[in-house]
Amino acid sequence: GPVEVAVDCKLDGIRVQVHRSGDEVHVFTRSLDEITDRVPEVVETVLGLAAEQVVLDGEAIALDDRGRPQPFQVTGARTASRKDVATLRAEVPLTTYLFDLLHLDGEDLLDLPARERFTRLEALAPVGSVVPRTVTADPETARRTFDALVAAGHEGVVLKALDAAYEAGRRGAAWVKVKPRHTLDLVVLVVEWG
């Protein structure tokens, strides 16, 4: 029969991997640049978790007053800007969404199936800090989730196999991105030779 998948919101923000040991937190980009001092909101989110040692995968994104995502350039400027971080934070606050749990208090979770890592993440993180995620085997439910997220201003969805181990730094075959297709039907009105 149909296989259950996680239908995750595709966020157009800054992908982050966050390492915490006690009160010390380090935030890295996908290319392993450390941006800890530029994203205090991410640090605070992770310090709020009931864990001593944790490694998480997530996304930091700027939302507008209505909770809709800002263009990527707005989010991206947070790590590039030379402005004082308190000013930036007031101008463009970031929201942290966590989508995977890779290590927890001495236990590496990388080889566990995604379903188990996601369940443990949901037990650890407050509900508003986990990426919007629907687990379903029903294509119609997945379609409705996709439509709702696109209507809310997001890029689309990422479908994730629930039996897959973690693949660092790249989307494996276990992840499929789905975005709306924007097509144009055009009629040729004028042809100029020459």
Model-derived segments and their meaning:
Residues 1-194:
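Catalytic cores of nucleic-acid ligases and guanylyltransferases
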